[in-house]
Amino acid sequence: MGSSLNKPLSDRVEDINNQSSMIYDPWRHRGDVNSTYHSSSSVTHRRRNHRLSPLEKQKMKNIQSLNFSVNDNLLQREEYEKTTKGLHLKKTFGKWIICLFLGVIVGCIAYVIKMVVQLLQGLKFHYTNHYVSNGLQGEAFLTFLGINLLFVFLSCLMVIVAGPLASSSGIPEVKGILNGVKVREALGFRALLGKIVSLVLSFSSGLFVGPEGPMIHIGSAVGAAISQFKSSTMGFYPSLFLSYRNDRDKRDFISIGAATGLAAAFGAPIGGVLFSIEEVSSFWSRQLTWRTFFTCVIAAFTTNFLLQGIGSSPDMHDTGLLTFGFSRLYLFRYSELLCFCFLGLIGGLLGAFFVFLNIHLNKWRKEKLKQNPYLRLFEALFVSVVTSVVCYYASFIFDCRYQSNIVIETSVCEDQSNTEMVQFFCPDGMYSELGSLLFGNPDQALRRLYSRTNNMFTLPPLLVFTLISLFFSIWSSGLWVAGGLFVPMMMVGAGFGRLFGQTISMWFTNIDSSIYALVGSAAMMAGYCRMTVCIVVIMVELTEGTQYLVPIILAVMISKWVGDFFNESVYEHLMEQKSIPFLQSKPPHSTNNIRISDVMSKNVVVLPEVCQVRLLVNILNSNNHNAFPVINSGPYDNQRLYRGIILRDHILVLLFYRVFYRGTGEEIYLDENFDFDKFTTETSKSPPPLSEMNFDQFELDSFIDLRPYMNSSGVTIHNTFSFVEAYKLFRNMGLRHLPVIDINNEVVGMVTRNDLF
Amino acid sequence: MGSSLNKPLSDRVEDINNQSSMIYDPWRHRGDVNSTYHSSSSVTHRRRNHRLSPLEKQKMKNIQSLNFSVNDNLLQREEYEKTTKGLHLKKTFGKWIICLFLGVIVGCIAYVIKMVVQLLQGLKFHYTNHYVSNGLQGEAFLTFLGINLLFVFLSCLMVIVAGPLASSSGIPEVKGILNGVKVREALGFRALLGKIVSLVLSFSSGLFVGPEGPMIHIGSAVGAAISQFKSSTMGFYPSLFLSYRNDRDKRDFISIGAATGLAAAFGAPIGGVLFSIEEVSSFWSRQLTWRTFFTCVIAAFTTNFLLQGIGSSPDMHDTGLLTFGFSRLYLFRYSELLCFCFLGLIGGLLGAFFVFLNIHLNKWRKEKLKQNPYLRLFEALFVSVVTSVVCYYASFIFDCRYQSNIVIETSVCEDQSNTEMVQFFCPDGMYSELGSLLFGNPDQALRRLYSRTNNMFTLPPLLVFTLISLFFSIWSSGLWVAGGLFVPMMMVGAGFGRLFGQTISMWFTNIDSSIYALVGSAAMMAGYCRMTVCIVVIMVELTEGTQYLVPIILAVMISKWVGDFFNESVYEHLMEQKSIPFLQSKPPHSTNNIRISDVMSKNVVVLPEVCQVRLLVNILNSNNHNAFPVINSGPYDNQRLYRGIILRDHILVLLFYRVFYRGTGEEIYLDENFDFDKFTTETSKSPPPLSEMNFDQFELDSFIDLRPYMNSSGVTIHNTFSFVEAYKLFRNMGLRHLPVIDINNEVVGMVTRNDLF
């Protein structure tokens, strides 16, 4: 409901704000102290007062909310009387079936992505290594660069074709949708397909992007798609999924999908559930925990099952897109906890630094490059060229080392493949340190960084690696290619962690720098996205051991605290940049002394219970409000007593199907041809546009009875409410419209997301 | 607000139900179909229609709710205007400090309990084994029995002294409190102390009880105590903790405390967080996740640190009250998943069976033994005798086995102490199988059951052990001693799991029965308490490995489904037995076609905004309602227009301090001596009883202005609401009173927990 965009039409509708002035208002007992210094526009509501430009503000104002409340009208109530226990069971059972399919599909997608990436990277390194092994530096580089550029070009092209929603990780959009913000087409089929293809190509291209963020978006999109199972383009609306075709059930499936995407990507089902609880979801229930867990397990199991195949080995082991065989025998000392705290501090600082630079870079991009596909394509290609050059030529800075330098400790039962290093242009029996980290898959680099073998790397290459990966992570995030931040951040963290571990091992004995790498990764992740439990669990699930729980937890905590001192998580900032009015679970303290009557939209357009079609059409045409309180004029005829609320879309459907009132007096007449099923089916589609409905004179003179179709259980508040309490009510109940009534039950205002944000 | 217990006094207050009869009611359009077949008493609301006896119903009706909403009155608003950012920061910082202390204290309690139990059990077995090694069966048994009886006697005595709230696990009470039910003294100092002592003694006595459930209760009690930091008996109310002294903040600390108790008991911080999210807490927020996690880590770390000591070994490893060195090398095959499903099925069946028998046994206890301490004490001693006899003499059923039969596989790097068996009365070099399981600590028995060594036990002793432990778990739960169910259930599960594993290993090769024991434990736990993610995480944290995630998850899921088919979780049933009106997150389907006007209490007692003391005292004396809507009589004087709501306790404080109205007309006069601090301090204490206030005639003729003290942001609903939507609003917002208004904003009803349950 836009704020006072239009004057109401109906003659019954008048500004009655002054009408109740003789009634005691608990805010105004001391003159007009409050009424002056809070104007409606000065509501700053974020924990940190971000300054939004007028354009950004306007953009946010235009964003609509999703409709999480049940439309509890007469039809619904009649339907309830008919529904048996069997139907409820059927609906619940159907949800489990959808979850099963969701898990299997997301698992398969994760498998396909992993396989195709493996294939593409294999091809790239196959051709490049052909020249490398022949010692042809120039040719090798050109091949490397050429293939990378091709991948980035195609990846960026996919984004241009499928729209910018296919780029980046998509987590801010998912978070916004789960908070109740309508982000158009974010979970559409085009964005889904574009993201999958773009992700495969960008991840193969050697850019510093990871697959996890996009997998979360992909999971959410699959969840939205499979639960709705309709197509507006194809006009395909099967009735089987009708009962799930509302924003509320859709939200639950999107929550599940997001968790599932992460679970499949990391092979971490518990981590997935916690990610959904802690980070993306705004509404949660116990039932959802259980269903999400089920779906995550199915997805992780599917990926795992496909990766191993059933024929080759009957043993099973759970692996995800990224798993490390981490050693389990070493224990650390109490005194080392101080070092882990230090790693947490570094992680928090670097994380906050990352967020700062990334956000400013994205702002610059938004201003300079805008949505221009040529500039965006050029930028992506440019980043790719620089990345390729640096990754290729950085290896030449340092001398080659002898493979025989690496001594594997006997106490470690480690996967030996981790220690295979990259020879690059080194003589036989020697290896290139930076080449082993930069010239290959990120997975392999991470495995090497997490390796137990302490003397694998020297300090300078680790430092250079950390700086390079930090720099390119910042630069690559926000390009018009699909890509997440988890893996790049883990690389940065593992880099500085191992660097630190090896540094202090010069003074102290028995330091295992692999733990430091692990802890560094966790700290870095906590530093940029400010999650806690979720990161700890993911790290535990990745490394398959709980021995390092205490150091990881310590580092994550400190990192989060340090990061929070400087700025908010990268998702919060990105949501703001993308004009997604996200409502935090609590309003900021600065709103404590605002009253709801200061911020509510005062010129509410209301509809009478029985309304002439002519009037209705005029009212609908004259504004763009999405909901209208339905009023009863009461015994004194100039009143507008609140009775219920009805959505514009529902009125449009009623008008389109000519559900006119044929009764008399106060009796309610229900159209036989327009029962609950019909109403639900039609309102779940996109509503017909008003302009295409042509009413003849007779129809315009008819009446529509809104009472059977309005929501009689809509939450309202009195105008004595404080902002804070109204916010909590709005946020906790997931409302879209919150009518404000006065002492006489007359509608005096309307609160929507835009008034609260 | 009890339902229509008294007739209202005020002359303005009349039954105005018929007044709005000419106004359209969306429920009544088809005659009086609805109005007849829903009477107020027929609301059955549980998923399964439990039949409550009239006495039980009456008991539940008398139970009050906690007050989670902010009392947003004029004083509060004035206070907000004064509060600076620094004060908010101070409050947040204070919460972290409280969490830190909470973690340390709970960790220390867990350590003390573990140490004392170790000492007591050590003494017991020291004296018993003295006779055992001399071959004196009779003397050994009498010593064993005598010490067990002494422990049980003292443990039961503690419960008799401290009240029945110190018995059992206390999880239902904590769950109820977190849902908003006022369970008197459940978290009091007496219950806390009684529970700690009783737990130590009962756990040492060889009864089939575990320490985890009580630890959760202890954690919650510590959380409540430390955050409130007051004593009503000692009249000690420091102002430092004033801002946390409300039900809302207390609830959060209790949630954290419950998680922390579990985390300290199991050494499983993530499991603790998930337990709080999944099982006990009804209200959760993202901030809470983070704070709970911090506290859990602190507690687990404290216990761990104390157990290991800093001097002896500089290495650290995380262990809780119960940890197993589980082997990590073995992988299972896909075909075995079927077996794990079967274990899930068994776990679900046994779990449901356990719940069924336990509930009926408790019902029998409640009817026959009542609260009679002698009977209760006798019962506990009787169970102890039978347990001691069975645990002691069962070992003689089976022949001794040669210690040399146990072959430790070389591939396993296991803690060798696990395989040390109990010799009991066997010749040297031999051991008693049942003695190793029943004659010793539960921890040791569990360790042996989870041991990798396959040929440690034969099938018949395992079967007998499973049956014995199932039988005694059922019998012991509900005795008047403190004790939980986690460990006994794990033992049952491990028993049948290992039994099953060893049985099928007769036909198939390479079966590791230790995995089966682990999976069996998980299945059994899921079968009786119906948790999912939490159990999986606890098992992972206990065994320190994620390799067996898939089997555990599979078994837990199937077990939960199977169990849910038969009955609800043991906590749901116990809450009902304890007359705790717990509100599930969703109302049951059977309430779909009830309207809120059918169930609301119709004879609401209202108060005018400015009220004569005489009238007020009369009204307060004439009923036991806890809140009163404050009304304005409007321009037509016989109306009762809703303006706000005020609690009885707050009125009592106002009366006690003679905060009388001295103004005139509509102007509001605030008493200078009764500001926000004073109001908060006084209302956070127990209110003075009305009977002790003696008013003189002048005072009785005075007026009280309720407007500055009433809650102006109280949520209300219209009488057109459906039961389901009102329930959701009430439950999600954690309300205590929900006034119902009609089309004229007149108060026509009141909804409280008792109307919804």
From Swiss-Prot, chains A, B:
Chief site of localization: membrane
Annotated CDD domains: CBS_pair_voltage-gated_CLC_euk_bac, ClC_6_like
Keywords recorded for this protein, A-Z: CBS domain, Chloride, Chloride channel, Ion channel, Ion transport, Membrane, Repeat, Transmembrane, Transmembrane helix, Transport, Voltage-gated channel
Subcellular location: Membrane
Superkingdom in the source lineage: Eukaryota
Any one of the GO CC terms: intracellular membrane-bounded organelle
Transmembrane segments: 97-117, 141-161, 196-216, 253-273, 292-312, 337-357, 378-398, 462-482, 484-504, 506-526, 535-555
Pfam families: CBS, Voltage_CLC
InterPro entries associated with the record: CBS_dom, CBS_dom_sf, Cl-channel/antiporter, Cl-channel_core, ClC
GO terms for MF: chloride channel activity; chloride transmembrane transporter activity
The UniProt record lists the keyword Repeat: yes
Membrane topology term: Multi-pass membrane protein
Residues of the CBS domain: 600-667, 710-757
The protein's role, per its UniProt record: Voltage-gated chloride channel. Chloride channels may have several functions including the regulation of cell volume, membrane potential stabilization and signal transduction.
Name of the protein described by the UniProt record: Chloride channel protein C
Species the sequence originates in: Dictyostelium discoideum
Taxonomic path: Eukaryota, Amoebozoa, Evosea, Eumycetozoa, Dictyostelia
